[in-house]
């Protein structure tokens, strides 16, 4: 079989404009690493009408950081090698679908229901928008009166979870093609219950015990290959309680804790290895 050549193959790093504005340097670093390997890499902003879309024709590799998949069918990218695959994007960007997927595969997670104020009997609770991320649209509710203050127009777009005291400390495992790259621990700041780096949570590196790492890898194996993060709590029995899956996982906290880690280079190196396998499979008659 002929050697797979990467030179001049087209690649896209896809973002929505809001995430791109927060992660410009990281996005450009991914493109730079692609170009160093002789691919032709470009950034595509999905919701920017001024963006130049001339580079999307005949794209073979797509690193999707947009939290969306609708553009795939629109531009006929269905035969391209996609990071992350559609199933990961769908599960990660709808918190109720995250819950359903985890329950289906018998992984421990936080009880989750679609918002219905008539069924809420106990407090405190956490109410989140299904497509929220970064700690936005997440509310700690102490009583029924506080529910009335929430900006909820469509109840089906929101979920309800019990408030967990362990939730002020959350762990994030960065997954790269089935391997646990690094894990960080995030501790909520002061009276805030959200353990998000973007909400000023304290961050430190965390070394996983072997059995916790094994469980994380089991989840990743079921979910599929790509680059994403699994956010979880540890209960009093030191068991994983999965909270969320983040397919466009931010790298700022990890970069802060690991200044010598060239994350874009690591991601592209691993991605190109799997991209080559994809190309070889396409060559097999």
Curated annotation (Swiss-Prot):
Domain ATP-grasp: start-end pairs: 107-285
GO biological process: SOS response
GO terms for cellular component: cytoplasm
UniProt-recorded Gene Ontology molecular function terms: ATP binding; metal ion binding; ribosomal S6-glutamic acid ligase activity
Pfam families xrefs: RimK
Name under which the protein is recorded: Uncharacterized protein MG011 homolog
Organism of this sequence: Mycoplasma pneumoniae (strain ATCC 29342 / M129 / Subtype 1)
């Amino acid at each position: 079989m002929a050697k797979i050549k990467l030179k001049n193959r087209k690649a896209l790093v896809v973002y929505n404009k809001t995430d791109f504005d927060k992660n410009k340097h990281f996005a450009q670093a991914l493109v730079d690493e692609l170009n160093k390997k002789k691919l032709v890499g470009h950034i595509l902003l999905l919701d920017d009408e001024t963006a130049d879309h001339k580079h999307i024709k005949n794209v073979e590799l797509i690193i999707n950081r947009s939290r969306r998949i609708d553009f795939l069918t629109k531009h006929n990218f269905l035969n391209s090698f996609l990071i992350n695959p559609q199933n990961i994007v769908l599960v990660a960007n709808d918190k109720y679908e995250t819950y359903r997927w985890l329950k289906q595969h018998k992984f421990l997670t936080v009880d989750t229901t679609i918002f219905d104020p008539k069924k809420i009997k106990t407090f405190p609770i956490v109410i989140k928008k299904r497509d929220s991320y970064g700690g936005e649209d997440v509310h700690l509710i102490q009583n029924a009166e506080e529910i009335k203050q929430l900006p909820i127009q469509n109840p089906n777009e929101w979920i309800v979870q019990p408030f967990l005291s362990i939730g002020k400390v959350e762990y994030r495992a960065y997954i790269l093609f089935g391997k646990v790259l690094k894990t960080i621990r995030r501790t909520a700041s002061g009276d805030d219950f959200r353990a998000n780096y973007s909400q000023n949570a304290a961050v430190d590196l965390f070394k996983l015990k072997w059995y916790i790492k094994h469980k994380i890898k089991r989840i990743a194996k079921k979910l599929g290959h790509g680059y994403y993060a699994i956010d979880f709590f540890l209960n009093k029995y030191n068991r994983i309680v999965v909270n969320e899956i983040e397919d466009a996982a931010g790298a700022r906290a990890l970069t802060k804790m690991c200044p010598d880690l060239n994350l874009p280079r690591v991601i592209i190196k691993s991605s190109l290895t799997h991209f080559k396998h994809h190309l070889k499979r396409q060559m097999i008659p």
